[in-house]
């Protein structure tokens, strides 16, 4: 992956996990 894509994933994945698990 490109560093930019990895950076985006690092930002969005925690938010998605937070929304699914509802543990923010």
Swiss-Prot record:
Family: Belongs to the frog skin active peptide (FSAP) family. Brevinin subfamily.
Disulfide bonds: 18-24
Pfam family, one: Antimicrobial_1
Protein name as annotated: Brevinin-1Bb
GO CC terms, sorted: extracellular region
Tissue-specificity statement: Expressed by the skin glands.
Species: Lithobates berlandieri (Rio Grande leopard frog)
Keywords associated with the record: Amphibian defense peptide, Antibiotic, Antimicrobial, Disulfide bond, Fungicide, Secreted
Lineage: Eukaryota, Metazoa, Chordata, Craniata, Vertebrata
Role according to the record: Antibacterial activity against Gram-positive bacterium S.aureus and Gram-negative bacterium E.coli. Has activity against C.albicans.
Predominant subcellular localization, coarse grouping: secreted
Location relative to the cell: Secreted
């Amino acid at each position: 992956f490109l560093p930019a894509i990895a950076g985006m994933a690092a930002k969005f994945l925690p938010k998605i996990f937070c929304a699914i698990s509802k543990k923010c």
